[in-house]
């Protein structure tokens, strides 16, 4: 038999991309899982590299829209700015996202995909909710995401490594 804890550990600790990589689950149970589920990793469809090492990725969402995610490497840290909405309702003067209009909230799965599918995932030291969208306008999915990022069954990150940036 297998447990949710085993599956979560493979996904969030070992970052497997295929169910077959979960080697402490029997082949029979892996086959059953693979028939019913996929891990759901959506690779970035575009990446723009800057001279300072920053990389802006374009990730697809579950409903065929796209969001930007920015990876920022520094000397002793690597930060990921994740999006929580497609577009934004706030229309802040300093931000171009509001000019796109608002198309919807990202699910926790869409937000986590930006982390999980990042080629540099093993280098990350910090995550900032400061991409497209206003986190407080999508609070339920922000809370689900931060729970998985900080829970023992998830990524087990310290909450100090996660920042939620808000206009309000």
PLM region spans:
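Flexible, acidic/Gly-rich N-terminal and inter-domain linker regions that tether
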Residues: 1-78
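Conserved Radical SAM active-site core
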Residues: 67-168
């Amino acid at each position: 038999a297998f447990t949710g804890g085993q599956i979560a550990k493979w996904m969030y600790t070992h970052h497997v991309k295929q169910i077959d990589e979960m080697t402490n689950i029997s082949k029979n149970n892996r086959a059953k899982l693979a028939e019913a589920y996929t891990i759901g990793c959506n690779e970035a469809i575009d990446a723009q590299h800057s001279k300072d090492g920053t990389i802006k990725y374009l990730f697809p969402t579950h409903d065929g829209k796209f969001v930007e995610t920015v990876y920022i490497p520094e000397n002793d840290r690597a930060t990921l700015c994740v999006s929580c909405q497609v577009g934004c309702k706030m229309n802040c003067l300093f931000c171009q996202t509001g000019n796109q209009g608002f198309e919807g909230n990202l699910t926790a799965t869409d937000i986590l995909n930006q982390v999980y599918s990042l080629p540099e995932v093993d280098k990350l030291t910090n995550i900032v909710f400061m991409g497209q969208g206003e986190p407080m306008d999508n609070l339920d999915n922000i809370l689900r995401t931060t729970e998985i990022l900080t829970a023992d069954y998830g990524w087990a990150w310290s909450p100090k490594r996660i920042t939620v940036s808000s206009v309000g």
